Amino acid sequence: MPRSTAILLTLTFIVGLLSLLVGAADVTFSSLLSGDAESLELLLISRLPRLLAILCTGAGMSIAGLIMQQLCANKFVSPTTGATISSAQFGILIALLFMPDSTIWSRAAFAFAAAIIGTWIFVWFILRMPMKDPVMVPLVGIMFGNVIGGITSFLAFRFDMTQALSTWLVGHFSLVLRGNYELVYLVVPLIAIAWIYAKWFNIVGMGRDFSKNLGVNYTFVLFSGLSIAAMITASIVTVVGSISYIGLIVPNLVAIFKGDDLRSTLADTAHFGALFVLCCDLIGRLIILPYELPIELIIGTLGSLIFIVLIFYRLRFGRRSLNKDLLMKLFGFEKKTPVCTSINGGTR
């Protein structure tokens, strides 16, 4: 196991144990080990499902962003900037309008379909209009997502569904309980499929001509990968609501240190995404204990700041990985070429 993966797993395990103990009700390891019925019930019904949902959310959104960035060959594409989240919310609204008593699985079906179609339209659009500036791609995605979000808000207001839709507009884990979160487990097999086809995703990321030269069906692999990313996103949005920036910043941070190969970075991206969401959730629960802040607020604040830093980094250094020389250049310490002095006193 790589050292980075082992460190991330250890940190996730430690923070995960702390997460099980934090909440409005007191739960301690001593009460759990002593067999206290109330503590065990709280652990199994609320705390453990919440922890599992957090881990699946962080890993899933990070991998969805990684897949989209690899396929589109643009480090600023993600479920947030690719209209995937907005499309999933639109699908949930359609399910609520036509089936007010729909189950979580029927809402998920509409969210899957809408997220896949919305993501396909976005990618089809940027393929038809190649943009020289990589920053323009997420801007187009954000505008497209805002159009879908505006239609969603209008329909929700028109049919008096604003209150019902609000649950999916702001991501939070406060309503995650045993029996209503299991849909998020779909993230696990979808990530496994992404790992299996990582080599083909890497090839497609090189471009249409490169893919054809290697005998890879560019269009099929592209839209299959986008469908996987959209389904991961839709399953998470259906359970916990909209959570922005994870799929954007986590793959970029991992790529800075590990490079751009999807298969070699997939595990660390999933682990770091899970750890990042877990830490943000813990912060949101501790700030105003016994109350909690929505995780979308914490991640939105941190994510927007990191996103700005990433824009400047990518514009300056491109897709290069971080190394010692790049760190020195980043902080203003240029590497100087040593001057050799000859025996006669001259320089060469």
Label every PLM stretch briefly.
Residues 1-348:
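Alpha-helical transmembrane segments in inner-membrane proteins
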